[in-house]
Amino acid sequence: MELYFGEYQHVQQEYGVHLRLASDDTQKSRSSQNSKAGSYGVSIRVQGIDGHPYIVLNNTERCLAGTSFSENGPPFPPPVINNLPLHSSNGSVPKENSEELQLPENPYAQPSPIRNLKQPLLHEGKNGVLDRKDGSVKPSHLLNFQRHPELLQPYDPEKNELNLQNHQPSESNWLKTLTEEGINNKKPWTCFPKPSNSQPTSPSLEDPAKSGVTAIRLCSSVVIEDPKKQTSVCVNVQSCTKERVGEEALFTSGRPLTAHSPHAHPETKKTRPDVLPFRRQDSAGPVLDGARSRRSSSSSTTPTSANSLYRFLLDDQECAIHADNVNRHENRRYIPFLPGTGRDIDTGSIPGVDQLIEKFDQKPGLQRRGRSGKRNRINTDDRKRSRSVDSAFPFGLQGNSEYLIEFSRNLGKSSEHLLRPSQVCPQRPLSQERRGKQSVGRTFAKLQGAAHGASCAHSRPPQPNIDGKVLETEGSQESTVIRAPSLGAQSKKEEEVKTATATLMLQNRATATSPDSGAKKISVKTFPSASNTQATPDLLKGQQELTQQTNEETAKQILYNYLKEGSTDNDDATKRKVNLVFEKIQTLKSRAAGSAQGNNQACNSTSEVKDLLEQKSKLTIEVAELQRQLQLEVKNQQNIKEERERMRANLEELRSQHNEKVEENSTLQQRLEESEGELRKNLEELFQVKMEREQHQTEIRDLQDQLSEMHDELDSAKRSEDREKGALIEELLQAKQDLQDLLIAKEEQEDLLRKRERELTALKGALKEEVSSHDQEMDKLKEQYDAELQALRESVEEATKNVEVLASRSNTSEQDQAGTEMRVKLLQEENEKLQGRSEELERRVAQLQRQIEDLKGDEAKAKETLKKYEGEIRQLEEALVHARKEEKEAVSARRALENELEAAQGNLSQTTQEQKQLSEKLKEESEQKEQLRRLKNEMENERWHLGKTIEKLQKEMADIVEASRTSTLELQNQLDEYKEKNRRELAEMQRQLKEKTLEAEKSRLTAMKMQDEMRLMEEELRDYQRAQDEALTKRQLLEQTLKDLEYELEAKSHLKDDRSRLVKQMEDKVSQLEMELEEERNNSDLLSERISRSREQMEQLRNELLQERAARQDLECDKISLERQNKDLKSRIIHLEGSYRSSKEGLVVQMEARIAELEDRLESEERDRANLQLSNRRLERKVKELVMQVDDEHLSLTDQKDQLSLRLKAMKRQVEEAEEEIDRLESSKKKLQRELEEQMDMNEHLQGQLNSMKKDLRLKKLPSKVLDDMDDDDDLSTDGGSLYEAPVSYTFSKDSTVASQI
């Protein structure tokens, strides 16, 4: 909902407010309870004269005229703005001091002294806790202006402040002033002092005993200066100024700002059903759980305004309201009388309107700053109605978490909790005091509704706006504790800082929810009205009717109206959407209510505050998501609308185009009908011309000569056709002979195949015998080997067995492969021969098709010539029509006819030229007449000649057709015979092929088996190769052992050498057999491919035969169609014979030239076709050759691949052997390294021994030197030498041996 309020702040316009809330028919239920003689009604008018708004409260029974207002009259006080914290240090207000305000039963009567002693004076401590000034003294009922009579002093406009320092009288002084005011009712209005910006004070309330008129000026301003950011908050309700409207709401809706009446004191424990705690929209107090809304606010500015959206979250209407429990429980609806909040009822005398106008029209005075001076004059065009923003933020601009909690908990709740007296079910009759208080509450609430609902006076009844604020304390016990302001400097500073923060928060929210953000915002529509408009009883009735509706119905209807605007959905769809949104809002409301109850129970718990903040943020996110969804739906609906409009526009365009085309078609049909009528007329004229121009026979003879020449050309063409037919027949006979030759060749090939099959069977038997003999020899050799090499059987038996199996299989596979290769070769040769013959047949058939195509071309030429003749005849007819018109009319008629001919013929340039020639020739009318006579004669002769030629052509065509039929029948018979023969041959061939296929399948099966066996053999060979590798290693070991044995068995070495040679030969044979097996595999693959190719070729031949049959059938159909066309041409020629009489010589010459040109073109086209066919054949041959080359290359590549695979295998073996050698070398290296290390160890050991020996020698040498020194006489003694030389030599000998060992 913050999005809405952010936008609501931008729509701050000033409007003049004129309300009249009088006692009308809708208040009868209230007046029933207040059935007192002194009952009164209230007439509220907010009139703006020169920028000064006033609220005038009239007594309906006695409207007294007072004194007039001066132009610079005394201003009225704003509502007092104080700092009342939601959670004080002690957490709550004592229950004893929570008594509500007790209003007098009659506002015009003086208050009783008993009540005046009940209200204690409250003052605010430094910590913001409400403290009782005198705890022992009973609370007094004195009001703020009673306790502070200095408030009644006039406002000093020059200093723009109140002098409150020298005026602090006691209660006795206030009683004196009260009695003086009661006695001397001289003042027409009460002069409330206006507080300055730095010195907020409490407003005063005039004595309620006064009667008359109270004019309250709703002007208040507070300017707050912050050292960091200068912000100004100004509250004003005006009629014809350009000032901002929401200033009072901004000022009073900030969090630290709370409007209180200074005479609202703690209530007693008495039950007061007529005074109910009320939660205002801009109050900063906590949410009253008990004060559930039973009635929505009466009106709103627009269906999308905040108050209309608040209705969505109103609580259910369940509990009945009784007079006893209204005060302290959930159903508190009446508003306490809070002076200074805009609801003050001044009972003073009401001055007349003339006096007020005279007051304002007096001396203008000086323009003063602040609120004291007269407002600046504004143009009447710029004057707008003012409107407060109190309804936008119900708790004021709060910046902390507590305000957000309260705001989220009270989203959607109505600010006006007003009950009619008829809705309250009293259990006992009310006293006069309570009735008076109820009437005061009603007038008080109506004041607020009048102040707030003036902005929507045109569209809907005014919505009540409540300025009173209620604070809930412990549990369900609710109390309205309204504090009096303190005049200390600290409270002033705090208020200024808090108001500044409030305005900043509001501005931030306004910027956050600016239209630049993508979220959808609810527009606020305001309806400005003139300054003299008033609320009529009809509007009040509408307001009451709206209040009688339930909250859910109003909310749903508002949502329905909102969703219905700008959407094309049905009513059901919009209602469903409304229900869904309403259910979601109810869930959100239930959550907010649950969170509100938890907060009321524990107001001081910060954890719950955080949870509620999180819930509030989630709710705002959900609301934003819902708004986004609404935006998307609205956008989608708009897009759908645009698409529908586009589709409609397109449909309209298409319809218009269709209508235009229909009109064009109708016009064209009319033109066609007109042209047909003209053609009929022309034909009739032609017949008349023919009858008239019978004299021109001489001219027609020339044309007959030309026609004879044409006939000669036609005869030559017929002869050429006869020759071509003969050639075709000869070619057909040759084809038949070729077919017979092919059949004979096929029979010969079949005989050859049979012979070769027999030879293959014989070869198979011989091969089998050879294989058996070879097996027997091998068995013998094996027995010899087994007998001779008993010691080596275990190592050699596996290899020999594998070799035997491979040899037997390889022999059988070789034999089978040889037989299959021979068969395949024979089949390939036969297939090649058949292919050659089939190609020859295809060529012959192609030649026949060419000839048939030539015939078709000739027939097409004849058709074209006939069509040309027909066109020329039509042209001649048109020329005759032109001639007649030229005889009758001038050259202009000729040109018109030429234009008509050009329009009829279109883009035919040749015909236009001919028409021009005809127009030039037709200028000489006399010559043309003679020519026409001659032409008539010639045309008659031409008729005869044409008839004869046509008959001849028909006969020739019949002969040709019969010949072609006979030839086709013969060909069909021959083809049938050939087909039958082919079928028989094919059946025989199929049988043979089936047999061969069976054999081939058997061979295939055998080949497959062989392949499987070969695969197994390959696997076995691989295993065998592995085994061979292992055997080779074993053989190497065995060879070493054999070599050892050979040394031992030299006598048996020769036999063993022979046997080893045989084994090597067998191994070589085995390797050769393996290679042959691989080759046989490749050959078998090739054979299978060739067989598949031969099958494909046979299928192609069959398809070609079928194509030939289809082509023959097409030719027959073409012949039939040609016959029909010939018949049609004959009929056309007969029809056109009459038209040829009116033809001319020049036309005939042109026709002949055209025919020659067309024949040349046809010949050139035929040549081009022949060249194209030759080129196509050449290309086909090249393609076949390329295919053969590709196949050969593929075969060569496969062979190369196989060879490469074998090489790779060999290389792999070599690599494996090399790796084994490398491993051996590495092992040998490791052994050598170990040996070297051992030798190094030995060397080190020996060196240590040497060193020890050297040390010993040195030690032995030292005593010998000592002994030599001891012998003085003999340097050398034999004894000494014999003693010491021997060990020295011995030691040196040891050293020498050690050195030699090293």
Curated annotation (Swiss-Prot):
Keyword Coiled coil: yes
Biased composition regions of type Polar residues, renumbered to the chain: 195-204
Residue ranges of the motif ZIM: 37-51
Gene Ontology BP term (one): negative regulation of stress fiber assembly
Keywords: Cell junction, Chromosomal rearrangement, Coiled coil, Phosphoprotein, Tight junction
Spans annotated as Tail: 1263-1302
A GO-annotated cellular component: bicellular tight junction
Residue ranges, compositional bias (Basic residues): 366-377
Tissue: Smooth muscle, spleen, testis, fetal brain, amygdala, corpus callosum, cerebellum, thalamus and subthalamic nucleus of adult brain.
InterPro entries per UniProt: Myosin_tail
Biased composition (Low complexity): 296-305
Region ranges (Head): 1-554
Major location (coarse): other
Entry superkingdom: Eukaryota
Coiled coil start-end: 604-1258
UniProt biased composition (Basic and acidic residues): 264-282, 378-388, 655-664, 917-929
Region (Disordered) residue spans: 75-104, 186-209, 251-305, 364-392, 655-675, 903-929, 1263-1287
Disease: Aromatase excess syndrome: An autosomal dominant disorder characterized by increased extraglandular aromatization of steroids that presents with heterosexual precocity in males and isosexual precocity in females.
Family membership noted in the UniProt record: Belongs to the cingulin family.
Domain-related comment: The head region is responsible for both junction and actin filament-based distribution.
Record's subunit section: Homodimer or oligomer. Interacts with CD2AP and SH3BP1; probably part of a complex at cell junctions.
The protein's name in its UniProt record: Cingulin-like protein 1
Species whose genome carries this gene: Homo sapiens (Human)
Recorded name of the encoding gene: CGNL1
